[in-house]
Design a protein with these regions (language model features):
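Short, surface-exposed ligand- or partner-binding patches at beta-edge/loop junctions that are enriched
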Residues: 68
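Rhodanese-like catalytic fold shared by cysteine-dependent sulfurtransferases
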Residues: 2-18, 22-26, 33-64, 73-105
Length: 105
């Protein structure tokens, strides 16, 4: 996947590997707080879709961002929002519902 992946081009498991291989990248779960507490991918930060403006506390506009939600729909909307805010390296990796790895609670 390249920059500005508005639509999921790979599955979340491949996206997690790409995140791990990208120096300085952030993994962001855009689901709500309650969903995040029920289970999330280890190492991810929770910045719900409605609070995306808070991203500036964690990342500059060149930081590689890898976003996920439950199905990939909200993370797709989040990619559009962040690109509109000037972020340059934003990738929608899809939904945690398809994730095969460890879940942190």
């Amino acid at each position: 996947m390249g920059l500005f992946d508005f639509f999921r081009g790979t599955n979340i498991n491949d996206g997690i590997q790409q995140f791990r291989d990208t120096e300085g990248a952030l993994l962001i779960d855009v689901r709500g707080d309650g969903e995040f507490r029920q289970g999330h991918i280890p190492g991810s930060a929770n910045i719900p879709l409605q609070r995306l403006k808070d991203i500036k506390k964690y990342a500059n506009k060149d930081t590689p961002l890898f976003l996920y939600c439950l199905s990939g729909a909200r993370s797709g909307r989040a990619v559009n929002t962040l690109v509109g805010m000037g972020y340059k390296a934003v990738t929608n990796i899809g939904g945690i519902a398809s994730y095969k790895g460890e879940i942190e609670r």
